[in-house]
Structure formats: C-alpha cells, structure tokens
C-alpha cells in the first residue's frame, strides 16, 4: 500500500485530496510555484517543494519538475487532481519510467478519450448516441464548410482536444462560419497544441448531465448515478447537483446504460465521468459529449449522496484493490447541490478579481461541506483559475439542501477580492431554479447580464460605510456599544459636531458621493440627506473584531483601517474609502497618533505639509495631508504643542506608521 502521495496540483483540489490521505494514514507532498509559496495547500501538506516560477508551463505543467519533487520527497505515487496534467499522457509515461504509481486510469483509456474525435468513434461503436455532426480526418476549411452546410445552422465548432469552453464557437449562419473557424482553431492551438476541429448540431435547449463511473483493475465497473450541470457561464459549470430533477426514469436508465457501455469499451479502471447533452425539444434525448478520465470538480455531490469517497477509491484502484461493491449494493440518499465560488465580478462580465485576502471566514452550517483552497493568508493571482473553492450542501430534499446552501453562501466572509457569491445566492432564490434547467439558464434569467441586486447597490451601503468609519473613531477597541444598554440615548460625543460630512468612494465600481451623517447618539446615526432616513445602529463588535451594524433591517459587518472600510453583508463584500472633513477634532489619524507625533495610519503619498518647525498647534488642527485610495486624508494634531521636527517631505510615499510631525509640549511662561 502507498504511504506517501505527491499531489501535482494546487488550491482546493490539493487540499481536498490531502484530507482523504490523512484519513487513510498516507503522508502528503505539495508542490508550489513562486506565486503559491504561502498558499493554503502548501501549509496543509506534510512536505512542500517548489517547482518553478508562477507561469503554469514553468511549474504545474512542468513534468520534469513534478518528477524531481516526487523523487526528492520520496513519494511513491502522484495524484494529478483535475486540470493541469490530469489527462496528459506525458505524466503517465514519466511515472511509469520512474517507477511511480499514477493515480488515475490506464494510459490507453486517457488516450482514447483525450480526443473528442476518437471518443465519438468509440462511443458510436459501443452503441452510445452522439450529437449529429462531423468528426472526420479531413480538416480542410473547404470540407468543414461543406459539412457545416450539411448539418445546418446553428451549429457548434469544437476543439477535438478541448475542454472548459476553449476552442468552442457557436455559428448561426454560413456567412460567419469561416471567421469563427479561424478563431476556434487559433484558440485550440494555443490552449492544447491541437487545432483539429469537430462540428456538432447546436441543441437549442440543452441540458448538461453526466454519469459518474468507478472501475478497478479486475474488470469491475459501476455507475454512481447522474449529476446535473446545466447552470453554466461561458461553457463552464457554476452549479451542480445530484440527483437531476425533472428527469424521467427511462432517460435516467438510458444514461446509465450508455455510460457503462462506453466505460466497458475502453476497460475503464478508475473514477471517470461520461458527459451527455439532453435535447429538451426531443423529449430529453441524450447524446454523448465527452468522457473526462479524471476526478471532476463536482464530485462532492456524488460523494454526499452515495457516501463513497471517490479519492479513496482512486487510490485503492491504483493500488490494485478490487471495488468492494456490486452495482446493486450502491444506493443514494437525499440531495446535494454544489456552487463554485470564483474570484470574479459577475456584474462586469465575470471579470477576474485579484489581490490579497484581507479576511476569510468559512461558514459553519450543518449539512454543508466546504472544499476551499484559501484562507486569510491567501492571495489570488492572475496566473491560475479563478475558482477559490466550493460549497456543497446535502439534505433530505432539494429544498432543504438549497436553503442550507444559501445560508452557507451568506456566511462565507471573504474580503479583499470580488466573488460571485451574491450571484450564486440570487440564482438559488429564483423560481426558475425549480423548473427544468438548461445551459441557457443564466442568459434567460439575466438577459442583460447579472447585476448587483438593489439591496446591495452602492447608494444603499455608502451610508453604512460612513457610519462604520465614524463608529470606529468613537468606539475604540474594548469599548461597548451603547446599543447594548437599553434606554441609553446620548447626543453626539464631545468634540464631534451634531452632523458630519464624509466623502465616500467604492473601490471596485468607482461610485462616489458625499454622506452627511446626523449624529443622534454614539451608537446611532442617520443619513441627513435622505428622505425618511432610517438609522444605522451599532449593535456590537468594537472589542477588536468587526463592527456589527444594522440598517433598514439588514445586518452588516465592517472593519475599518484608517480611511478604508470593508463591508460584508448577505455574501457580498465591498471596500470603501472614507474621507472626513478637514479640521475635525477626531480622525482616523488622530486615533493612531501618539501623544508626541502625528503618524500615517495607512500607506500613502504626502501631498501637503501645513506646519513647519516652531509653529504652535492646537488639538485637532490639521498638520498634513496624505493621498491614499484616490482620497485625501487629513492628519491632525493629537494635542496642543509646538512642532519640533518634520519626519517626511511632500512627495514622499510613506508606509503606515511613519511619523510625519513630531511635537513638543507647550512651554508655560513663568511669572
């Protein structure tokens, strides 16, 4: 039996494989690029070795670097995870030559299914129905155009070696065919090094279903039922579930039979998935799409409904162990739904989001599994896939699983980057989610693209950001909100005006404006400019953790650092800059100033010095201006005194904590 496995992957799948290995008593080896040196998967492994610079071709796709790490660590086997090298024959051959166990199917199965053209030929021979189209050897433009006219429009151009939507184009007319073929070929060549194309009739209302297979090296093969993967964006899955709803028993059995027939045809001996498209306009007629000869991202929904650990079975099968069940022994219980949590902005065409995380708190919800590759120390870089992790909910019914999942979405607190969590929650809330699904779901639900829900728009959170900044100044760590003491209602704190004008700006959207706060009490403010303004109440938290606020019946968490305010509510994160009026007696800078110095409480550019050595200043008097986050930040004297020394010059970029102005106490004249 293997006792040390190297996982040739990163992120959430590496962490997920480690979890099973720990349970089995197997030591783990992580590999990492320079960009991933502090990544979560590196810290969770027993051993971690560097394999090269950030670009994948120089690290995670470098077979020699992977083999060198396996040799140096003493690993006996390599698990490829998914993506990267998981279906590359080069890695399998290298493992064989090095005497290492490759945890996956045999080489011939991967080779057969690695080409969409070859896989369709094998599928047809096995009696598996395929989408009408063309997958011939003649790849000339003339022949492909001729076949396109025969198939009819609309149709799909697909890369033979493709996946994840790369090298795929929908063509609606003959006039567009040549241009789209050129684009698809170029993309396929760049992504896969293979420009061969196939053509398929476009199914207008397709469902995307798949069947999980599990085999061993003794000729045994079983299915673990189906998964629904129809909710997609840009041909990439977003939400998956098991079982599939609105599916007849007859179609379900046809899927199982077809998947097993294909698996037997290639002697499949590990975990793999056979994917189908169902034509809703033809009674859910199933057609073979492709076979993935590896673990799938969405494998947890099968694990939760069957109780079978697919990673464990991959390892056991690779070690020559027979499957412990027959087909009739395998049952499933309840319903499971998974969402993929990505670092992206759905409101901006799913634009990727990068940067260091400022906070990361995973949800703890009964019946919900978190497969994550991030924590509070992580940084999202542009070098790798946008997926941060997955939330998978299990329940006795689909409704129970969905509600648990929505609760988990609302409680996964991620700061520092934009995620698709708000969109995922809205999708789960739609009545259409209870109807038969199709791959057009997101296009039909959001015809103009997904937009931030009204309750989370900047104008609704600007006042909360301003209030959070104010509360952070008036409630130092260790203080207790007055809202927790019933009956106490005071006027504005000493040193503060009855109303306060603050300039606010949303870091992502650029939305900016001025909020005028009416300071009703130390723990209660309202937007003076708004009609029928509802108060923002501080309801807890200023003891070192996040502030907790309530506004219009909605709860928020806020963290404040200088003039940067991070807000979190209902699974949605925003970061605001807040600039107070010049001359306030209390500011963020004052809170961080010592009795003898005015210091920069955040990194920034020193744009103005308002004092010089020898000048007498009073408490709260502006002494300098910093520019940070495209806002100007006024630094004020913490007490009266005489300027003794200037610690930085205009034009300097100063780090947080830099003394800008040093003060001496005023000399009292003796009489």
Regions found by a protein language model. Give the residues of each.
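N-terminal beta-alpha lobe that positions the nucleotide/phosphoryl donor
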Residues: 1-274, 278-299
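Short amphipathic alpha-helical segments
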Residues: 3, 166-167, 243, 385-391, ...
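Short, well-ordered beta-strand elements within core beta-sheets of diverse protein domains
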Residues: 168-170, 201, 247, 387-396, ...
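Short acidic-glycine loop/turn motifs at beta-strand connectors
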Residues: 173, 215-220, 278-283, 364, ...
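A generic structural motif
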Residues: 203, 292-295, 345, 542, ...
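Catalytic cores of soluble metabolic enzymes centered on carboxylation/carboxyl-transfer
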Residues: 300-542, 622, 655-671
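Catalytic P-loop NTP-binding/switch module of NTPases
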Residues: 555, 561-601
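Structured functional modules or segments
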Residues: 587-671
């Amino acid at each position: 039996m293997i006792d040390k496995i190297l996982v040739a992957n990163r992120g959430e799948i590496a962490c997920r494989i480690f979890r099973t290995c720990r349970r089995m008593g197997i030591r783990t080896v992580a590999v990492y690029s320079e960009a991933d040196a502090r990544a979560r998967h590196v810290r969770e492994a027993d051993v971690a070795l560097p394999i090269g610079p950030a670009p994948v071709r120089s690290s995670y796709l470098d077979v020699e670097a992977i083999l060198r790490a396996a040799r140096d660590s003493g690993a006996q086997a390599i698990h490829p995870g998914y993506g990267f090298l998981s279906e590359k024959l080069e890695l399998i051959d290298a493992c064989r030559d090095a005497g290492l166990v490759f945890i996956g199917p045999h080489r011939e199965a991967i080779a057969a299914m690695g080409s969409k053209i070859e896989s369709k030929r094998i599928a047809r021979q096995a009696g598996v129905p395929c989408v009408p189209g063309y997958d011939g050897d003649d790849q000339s433009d003339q022949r492909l155009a001729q076949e396109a006219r025969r198939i009819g429009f609309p149709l799909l151009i697909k890369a033979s070696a493709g996946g994840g939507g790369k090298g795929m184009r929908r063509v609606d007319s003959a006039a567009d065919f040549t241009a789209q073929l050129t684009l698809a070929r170029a993309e396929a060549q760049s992504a896969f090094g293979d420009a061969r194309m196939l053509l398929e009739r476009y199914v207008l209302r397709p469902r995307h279903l798949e069947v999980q297979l599990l085999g061993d090296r003794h000729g045994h093969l079983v299915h673990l039922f189906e998964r629904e993967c129809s909710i997609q964006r840009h041909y990439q899955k977003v939400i998956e579930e098991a079982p599939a709803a609105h599916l007849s028993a007859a179609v379900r059995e046809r899927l199982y039979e077809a998947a097993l027939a294909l698996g037997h045809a290639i002697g499949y001996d590990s975990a793999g998935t056979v994917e189908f498209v169902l034509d809703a306009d033809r009674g859910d007629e199933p057609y073979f799409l492709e076979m993935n000869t590896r673990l799938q991202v969405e494998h947890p929904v099968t694990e939760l409904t069957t109780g079978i650990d697919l990673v464990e079975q991959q390892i056991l099968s690779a070690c020559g162990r027979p499957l412990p069940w027959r087909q009739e022994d395998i049952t499933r219980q309840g319903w499971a739904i998974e969402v993929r949590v990505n670092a992206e902005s759905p409101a901006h065409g799913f634009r990727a989001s990068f940067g260091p995380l400022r906070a990361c708190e995973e949800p703890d919800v009964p019946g919900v599994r978190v497969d994550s590759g991030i924590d509070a120390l992580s940084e999202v870089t542009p070098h790798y896939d946008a997926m941060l992790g997955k939330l998978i909910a299990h329940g006795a019914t689909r409704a129970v699983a969905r509600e648990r999942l929505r609760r988990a979405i609302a409680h996964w607190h991620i700061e520092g980057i934009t995620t698709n969590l708000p969109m995922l929650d809205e999708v789960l809330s739609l009545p259409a989610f209870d109807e038969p699904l199709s791959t057009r779901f997101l296009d039909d639900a959001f015809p103009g693209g997904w937009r931030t829900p009204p309750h989370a728009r900047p104008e609704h959170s600007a006042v909360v950001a301003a209030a959070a900044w104010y509360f952070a100044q008036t409630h130092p760590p260790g203080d207790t909100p007055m809202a927790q003491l019933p009956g106490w209602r005071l006027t504005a704190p000493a040193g503060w005006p009855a109303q306060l004008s603050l300039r606010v700006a949303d870091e992502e959207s650029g939305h900016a404006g001025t909020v005028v706060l009416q300071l009703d009490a130390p723990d209660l403010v309202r937007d003076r400019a708004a009609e029928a303004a509802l108060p923002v109440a501080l309801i807890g938290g200023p003891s070192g953790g996040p502030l907790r606020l309530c506004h219009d019946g909605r709860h928020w968490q806020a963290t404040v650092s200088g003039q940067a305010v991070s807000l979190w509510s209902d699974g949605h994160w925003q970061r605001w800059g807040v600039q107070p009026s010049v001359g306030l007696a209390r500011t963020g800078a004052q809170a961080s100033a010592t009795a003898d110095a005015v210091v920069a409480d955040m990194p920034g550019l020193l744009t103005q010095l308002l004092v010089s050595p020898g000048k007498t200043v009073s408490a709260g008097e502006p002494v300098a201006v910093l520019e940070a986050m495209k806002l100007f930040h006024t630094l004020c004297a913490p007490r009266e005194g005489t300027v003794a020394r200037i610690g930085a010059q205009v034009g300097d970029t100063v780090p947080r904590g830099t003394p800008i102005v040093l003060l001496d106490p005023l000399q009292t004249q003796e009489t």
